[in-house]
């Protein structure tokens, strides 16, 4: 019965075919349907009586004979295709000749059951069907004796095609039947092999198997029955059409034989697909009736078949429910595409308008103006009430253009679910309250950036918005305690809350929040100084689903909070983010408790927690791959060791910020190379970062890096070349902060940076240097042209310095590099004082002038370490004794004293000496490696410097002087230890010190050579730049002086001779002079008056002189690529700039 019902339902869902006479019904015969035989026969008889035309009356006998023949024909046709004789009982599987019932026998007879399924002979069915078709067609030929022979051949062809199609249907049924039989047979064999006839499980399986067989037979029976009905319908419709055709022929009308159309219809049937039956049969009957009616009503001799109209197709989408249609239209990517469909129908218009106004797309002022033009109208003036369709409003991108007036137009949006007013600084609380009034479906409100937030917003939410789930209101200073309490009490569904900078937020409200809002997953109550550990303990205990927790700049928070929490709850599995920035009283104990409670923590913000040490980083390393963001700005006690442990364990970190962590060195940059998913680096004011560390990090991370934002402001030791390599390795880089990095404060580079925020002071504007967006791409392109080509940051530093010397043609033919260096050094030593003085280094603010360059004796740099010139006379050691003492030396410490060792522990570096002397030598080893690192950094910086001309060298000169003084101090300490050992007269002490000298003499000599070569290149670079800068200074003076002289000469000529008419406008003269100078620089020197002007002194302002000397930009000369002055009053850019800098460094506002 289930199969019958399914077939019946399927037949009712069939689609109408195409009934054009020349095309035929498409796929109307290819589905299974269940029809009642009696109803079908009655319908056919009714159709025959009502639509069949009467034969023209010739004689009563002829009419009677034809009527009798028709009755005989109908009876014969019904008998031929009647399968009622095939009884259901004869088709069911039997057991010993008896039909099976629900009480199956325990005797298992699989073969007998399978044979019962083969009771239907498909060949017999095919023969019966074809016999019926043949008889029916033969009767047609007898009843229509006047048909020409050609048309009789068409009838015969139609019969053959019908028979072929019947055979195809039966083959499909037979294949399906055999497939089912084979599957059942396999199951029978499996059961037979098991031999568990008495098993209840086997009996249960047999019951299921028999039901499957019965279902298969029912399905097969229904398929054959449906096929009979389909063939019957074809024959009936063909008969009616052929009768009508014959009557038309008798009347003398020219009509088309319908046999061809029926042949096309039969050939178009696909027996392998399932299509509509019921509607297809109805369309076929409609065609027959229309054909006959046209024959009776149109006696003229025209082609009747051409007047049969095609049934207008039904648009499929119109049959879908409105909800489904809404989902389909909403899937279009571009919303403006669906605007074209507004005129399809009223239903479509309503759905499309709802989609368009559900979340209006407002990203720029033009879109806002267009949207407001509609919202200014009342609901009576518009076709639809658009306010009721709006559910989400976001004005974050047009915040500067939103005021109270514009927001008031949205009052009445009763179905509003989300309202976002981020950075809408001109809006007050009154229109916000008006918009929210009556919004009972409201879920989220974000008014970040609203300066004036009062009680009415909180009261409105408490009264009209019981479903609110998210409320973000930073800087809620003016909200009273009562309003806060009222809002919390009436917001039981609250999940996300952000109320900051409110002194009324105290322990009572926090506890109320824990009791009334148990669904909270995000809590942000930063800058709430009256909240203490006790209330937060209750809050964290109740909120088991908490994911994000922020409580910053609160000195009341101590280690007791999370230590007590560990005693109350076992864990906080949902916690993903914690922000305790500015909570200065927490220590490493808090971090340990947090890690134990929240093992899946992803984001940790501990900026300005000054008591945090490396121990916290060791604890955070337990989070492993879960950790993604770490912020340790102003955590001064963090060192490279803690960073190394953190990065080695947490390799999926994406964002790091160590701003103002002054103890971090280049080793931290090396460790950053182990983070393959790193996107953001914050190292603002990490003054120990140098070119060497940055180049190594870029080299280790490789090309196509994932970095997107890099903050290196106040890293004053960086030069242009490592930044160039960083840009070339990071194609995704969109933000680069280099504020107060002297090498980048030059007009040709700062022209690509963003304008400084409007609230910055003049000094802050001078050092501001931030590149973002297109500025980063322009900077990369400019540095490509500015920097000497290199094959990545792996180029040997010594090779770079040597090539620079060769590029200046300072090595003569046949002269070795050593000889050339000695000659160059001799020449430079004579000019060093003048070169260094010309840099104007003493004018640099903040530079320590105690390290005077006059103290550097460049002529005797090779003798800076005089300790190894001192010899120990009379001390002799055999090779066995030397090897024995060498075995006692801790060579690991000598090679790297800063590896994972205790700095306070002393290792053997001078075997045989006492503990005090060995401790002194350990200290000297550490100092030597610090010196070596400084010289390596200095060497890399100089190598980077020579790649780009006119870089700021003041800090390199300072580094050079400082390194020289370190060398002097280290030499003094070594000489003092040697003197003490020699005066002691202890042979063992002297032998131990000789072993140390044996290990380190070559290292010290190598250090001196690196320093010497770097100082030579640096001085050559300064000399070359000073020469060019002097030339530029002369050209500037000449240009200004020439313009002044030209104006005087022009005035004199006009007054005296009035011969030449020269433009008197000063700006025009300047432009003319500029164009002339740009066209040919030599024209200026060819002017007789050019050299005369150098005889006069011309005043240059200090700013101009500083620009010429140091490459600093002039604030009045900042230009963009199109030589247009940058507008520094752009509010969006200024706000964005200030936000980026502030987000990168908590104290960036103290520029």
UniProtKB/Swiss-Prot annotation:
GO BP term, pick one: SCF-dependent proteasomal ubiquitin-dependent protein catabolic process
GO function term, MF aspect, one: ubiquitin-protein transferase activity
Subcellular location: Membrane
Membrane is among the record's keywords: yes
Compositionally biased intervals (Low complexity): 38-49, 1066-1080
PROSITE patterns hit by this protein: FBOX
Location of Phosphoserine modifications: 199, 300
One Gene Ontology cellular component: nucleus
Composition bias type Basic and acidic residues, residue spans: 1-18, 58-72
SMART domains: FBOX, LRR_CC
LRR repeats (start-end): 399-423, 424-449, 450-475, 476-501, 502-527, 528-553, 554-582, 583-608, 609-634, 635-660, 661-685, 686-714, 715-740
UniProt entry keywords in alphabetical sequence: Carbohydrate metabolism, Glucose metabolism, Leucine-rich repeat, Membrane, Phosphoprotein, Repeat, Ubl conjugation pathway
Pathway assigned in UniProt: Protein modification; protein ubiquitination
Induction section of the entry: Expressed constitutively at low levels.
UniProt keyword Repeat, yes or no: yes
Residue ranges occupied by any F-box domain in the UniProt entry: 314-361
Region (Disordered), start-end ranges: 1-72, 1066-1090, 1118-1151
Subunit structure: Interacts with SKP1. Component of the probable SCF(GRR1) complex containing CDC53, SKP1, RBX1 and GRR1.
Role, per record: Substrate recognition component of a SCF (SKP1-CUL1-F-box protein) E3 ubiquitin-protein ligase complex which mediates the ubiquitination and subsequent proteasomal degradation of target proteins. Recognizes and directs ubiquitination of phosphorylated CLN1, CLN2 and GIC2. Probably constitutes the primary response element required for the generation or interpretation of the signal that induces glucose repression.
Protein's recorded name: SCF E3 ubiquitin ligase complex F-box protein GRR1
Highest classification ranks of the organism: Eukaryota, Fungi, Dikarya, Ascomycota, Saccharomycotina
Gene from which the chain derives: GRR1
């Amino acid at each position: 019965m289930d199969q019958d019902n399914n077939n019946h339902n399927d037949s009712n869902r069939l689609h109408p075919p195409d009934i054009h006479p020349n095309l035929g019904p498409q796929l109307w015969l290819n589905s299974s349907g269940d029809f009642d035989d009696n109803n079908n026969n009655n319908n056919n008889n009714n159709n025959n009586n009502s639509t069949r035309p009467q034969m023209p009356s010739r004689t009563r006998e002829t009419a009677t004979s034809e009527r009798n023949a028709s009755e005989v024909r109908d009876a014969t046709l019904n008998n031929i295709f009647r399968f009622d004789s095939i009884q259901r009982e004869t088709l069911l599987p039997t057991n010993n000749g008896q039909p099976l019932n629900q009480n199956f026998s325990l005797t298992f007879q699989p073969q007998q059951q399978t044979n019962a399924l083969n009771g239907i002979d498909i060949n017999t069915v095919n023969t019966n069907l074809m016999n019926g078709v043949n008889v029916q067609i033969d009767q047609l030929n007898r009843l229509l004796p006047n048909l020409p022979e050609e048309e009789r051949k068409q009838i015969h062809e139609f019969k053959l095609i019908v028979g072929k199609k019947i055979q195809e249907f039966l083959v499909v049924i037979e294949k399906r039947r055999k497939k089912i039989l084979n599957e059942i047979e396999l199951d029978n064999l499996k059961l037979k092999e098991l031999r568990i006839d008495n098993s209840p499980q086997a009996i249960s399986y047999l019951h299921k198997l028999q039901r499957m067989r019965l279902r298969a037979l029912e399905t097969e029976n229904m398929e054959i029955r449906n096929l009979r009905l389909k063939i019957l319908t074809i024959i009936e419709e063909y008969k009616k059409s052929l009768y009508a055709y014959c009557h038309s022929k008798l009347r003398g009308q020219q009509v088309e034989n319908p046999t061809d159309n029926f042949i096309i219809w039969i050939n178009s049937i696909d027996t392998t697909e399932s299509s509509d039956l019921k509607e297809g049969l109805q369309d076929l009957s409609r065609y027959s009736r229309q054909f006959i009616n046209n024959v009776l009503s149109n006696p003229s001799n025209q082609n009747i078949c051409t007047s049969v109209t095609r049934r207008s197709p039904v648009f499929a989408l119109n049959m879908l429910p409105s909800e489904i249609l809404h989902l389909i239209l909403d899937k279009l990517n571009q919303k403006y595409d669906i605007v074209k469909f507004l005129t399809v129908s009223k239903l479509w218009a309503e759905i499309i308008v709802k989609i368009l106004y559900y979340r209006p797309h407002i990203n720029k002022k033009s879109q806002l103006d267009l949207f407001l033009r509609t919202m200014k109208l009342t609901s009576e003036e518009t076709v639809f009430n658009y306010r009721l369709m709006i559910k989400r409003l976001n004005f974050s991108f047009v915040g500067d253009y939103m005021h109270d007036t514009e927001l008031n137009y949205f009052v009445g949006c009763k179905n509003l679910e989300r309202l976002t007013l981020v950075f809408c600084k001109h809006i007050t609380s009154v229109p916000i309250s008006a918009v929210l009034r009556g919004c009972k479906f409201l879920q989220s409100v974000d008014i970040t950036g609203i300066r004036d937030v009062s009680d009415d917003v909180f009261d409105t939410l408490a009264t009209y918005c019981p479903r609110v789930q998210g409320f973000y209101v930073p800087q809620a200073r003016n909200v009273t305690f009562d309003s806060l309490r009222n809002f919390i009490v009436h917001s039981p569904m609250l999940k996300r809350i952000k109320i900051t900078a409110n002194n009324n937020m105290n322990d009572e409200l926090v506890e109320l929040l824990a009791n009334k809002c148990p669904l909270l997953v995000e809590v942000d109550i930063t800058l709430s100084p009256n909240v203490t550990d006790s209330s937060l303990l209750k809050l964290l205990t109740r909120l088991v689903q908490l994911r994000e927790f922020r409580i910053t700049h609160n000195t009341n928070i101590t280690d007791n909070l999370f230590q007590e929490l560990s005693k109350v709850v076992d864990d906080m599995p949902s916690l993903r983010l914690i922000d305790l920035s500015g909570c200065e009283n927490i220590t490493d104990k808090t971090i340990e408790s947090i890690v134990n409670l929240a093992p899946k923590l992803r984001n940790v913000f501990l900026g300005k927690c000054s008591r945090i040490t490396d121990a916290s980083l060791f604890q955070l390393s337990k989070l492993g791959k879960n950790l993604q963001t770490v912020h340790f700005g102003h955590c001064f006690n963090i060192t490279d060791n803690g960073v190394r442990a953190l990065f080695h364990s947490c390799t999926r970190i994406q964002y790091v910020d160590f701003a103002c962590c002054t103890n971090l060195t280049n080793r931290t940059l090396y460790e950053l190379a182990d983070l393959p998913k790193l996107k953001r680096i914050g190292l603002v004011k990490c003054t120990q970062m140098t070119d060497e560390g940055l180049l190594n990090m870029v080299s280790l991370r490789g090309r196509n890096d994932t970095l997107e934002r890099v903050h290196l402001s106040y890293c004053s030791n960086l030069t242009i070349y490592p930044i160039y390599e960083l840009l070339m390795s990071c194609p995704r880089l969109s933000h680069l902060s280099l504020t107060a990095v002297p090498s980048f404060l030059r007009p040709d580079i700062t022209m690509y940076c963003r304008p400084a925020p409007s609230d910055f002071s003049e000094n802050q504007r001078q050092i501001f240097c931030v590149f973002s967006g297109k500025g980063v791409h322009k900077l990369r392109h400019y540095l490509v042209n500015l920097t000497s080509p290199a094959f990545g940051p792996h180029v040997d530093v010594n090779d770079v310095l040597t090539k620079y010397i060769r590029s200046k043609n300072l090595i003569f033919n046949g002269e070795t590099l050593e000889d050339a260096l000695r000659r160059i050094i001799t020449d430079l030593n004579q000019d060093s004082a003048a070169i260094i003085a010309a840099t104007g280094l003493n004018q640099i603010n903040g530079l320590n002038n105690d390290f005077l360059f006059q103290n550097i004796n460049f002529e005797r740099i090779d003798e800076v370490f005089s300790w190894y010139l001192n010899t120990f006379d009379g001390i002799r050691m055999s090779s066995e004794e030397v090897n024995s003492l060498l075995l006692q030396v801790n060579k690991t410490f000598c090679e790297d004293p800063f590896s994972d060792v205790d700095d306070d522990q002393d290792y053997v570096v001078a075997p045989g000496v006492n503990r005090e002397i060995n401790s002194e030598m350990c200290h000297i080893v550490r100092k030597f490696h610090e010196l070596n690192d400084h010289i390596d950094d200095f060497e890399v910086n100089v190598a980077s410097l020579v790649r780009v001309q006119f870089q700021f060298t003041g800090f390199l000169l300072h580094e050079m002087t400082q390194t020289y003084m370190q060398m002097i101090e280290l030499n003094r300490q070594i000489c003092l230890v040697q003197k003490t050992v020699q005066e002691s007269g202890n042979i063992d002490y002297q032998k131990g010190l000789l072993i140390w000298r044996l290990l380190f003499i070559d290292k010290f000599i190598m250090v001196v050579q690196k320093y010497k070569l770097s100082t030579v290149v640096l001085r050559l670079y300064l000399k070359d730049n000073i020469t060019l800068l002097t030339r530029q200074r002369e050209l500037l003076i000449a240009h200004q002086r020439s313009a002044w002289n030209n104006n005087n000469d022009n005035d004199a000529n006009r007054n005296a001779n009035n011969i030449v008419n020269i433009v008197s406008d000063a700006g025009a003269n300047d432009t003319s002079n500029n164009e002339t100078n740009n066209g040919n620089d030599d024209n200026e020197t060819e002017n007789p008056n050019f050299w005369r002007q150098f005889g006069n002194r011309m005043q240059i302002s200090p700013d101009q002189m500083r620009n010429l000397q140091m490459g600093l930009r002039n604030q009045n000369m900042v230009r963009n690529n199109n030589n247009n002055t940058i507008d520094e009053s752009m509010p969006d850019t200024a706000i964005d700039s200030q936000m980026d800098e502030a987000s990168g460094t908590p104290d960036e506002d103290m520029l």
